[in-house]
A protein has these predicted regions:
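Hydrophobic adenine-recognition pocket in adenosine-nucleotide-binding enzymes
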Residues: 91
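Hydrophobic beta-strand segment of the Class I
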Residues: 86-87
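A short glycine-rich, Lys/Arg-flanked "PGG" loop and its adjoining helix->strand segment in the class I
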Residues: 101-113
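Residues at alpha-helix caps and immediate loop-helix transition turns in enzyme cores, especially N-
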Residues: 34, 99-100
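Class I (Rossmann-like) S-adenosyl-L-methionine-dependent methyltransferase catalytic domain
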Residues: 1-17, 24, 31-77, 116-199
């Protein structure tokens, strides 16, 4: 099932990409619509396919120390690789808080000074059992494809927890969609002359 939703945060993040030569990391799978969207913009797009690399049990139940040791192999980067935009989509909802905190730290280290992390946090009571596919229809519109009719309880992360899970980053803007998703664009606190939030 597919539905289109407004995404003003993504529109803003895309408009602020340096042109040409911006670097974008998509943590989701390779989708032709997203590749086709970024190609005319002269963007270097890297597809991590992170949700396919990590199984459900590992995302939620892996021992923290083992998870942190495995993470560089699950989400490898080239030396000096940096990104102007990271598309996390709804993946944060499918990791335990400890596991996602480690992922967020790894991503933050790779954001350029003016870079941004785009993410979608479920605020409704339930969510699809597995992450959705997201396709960029236009800069301010996302198509969400639900892959599973089965639902599970959503983590419903409050704003304070979202802050704690992304040390060093702040959200100068967020948007609550009618489909039960809070959209965040998180950027380096230093870029906004703000101190990092305590963890």
């Amino acid at each position: 099932m597919r539905a289109e939703h407004p995404s003003p945060g993504l529109k803003s993040a895309i408009e602020h990409l340096p042109r040409p030569g911006a670097s974008v990391l998509d943590l989701g799978c390779a989708l032709a619509a997203n590749v086709d969207f970024f190609h005319p913009l002269g963007v270097r797009l890297r597809i991590a396919d992170f949700d396919r690399t990590v199984d459900e049990e590992e995302a939620r139940d892996a021992i923290p120390s083992l998870w942190e040791r495995r993470l560089p192999h699950l989400l490898p980067f080239h030396p000096g690789e940096r990104f102007d935009l990271v598309l996390a989509w709804d993946l944060p909802n499918y990791f335990s808080r400890e596991r996602w905190l480690a992922v967020a730290r790894r991503i933050t280290e790779r954001l350029t000074p003016g870079g941004a992390l785009h993410m979608l946090v479920r605020v409704g009571a339930e969510m699809p059992r597995q992450p959705c596919y997201y396709r960029i229809v236009e800069p301010g519109t996302l198509s969400e494809e639900i892959l599973s009719a089965t639902t599970v309880p959503a983590p419903r992360l409050p704003h304070a927890d979202v802050e704690k899970l992304h040390p060093g980053l702040v959200a100068p803007r967020s948007h609550l969609g009618k489909h039960g998703v809070q959209e965040y664009v998180r950027e380096h606190a230093a870029e906004h002359n703000l101190p990092p939030r305590p963890t």
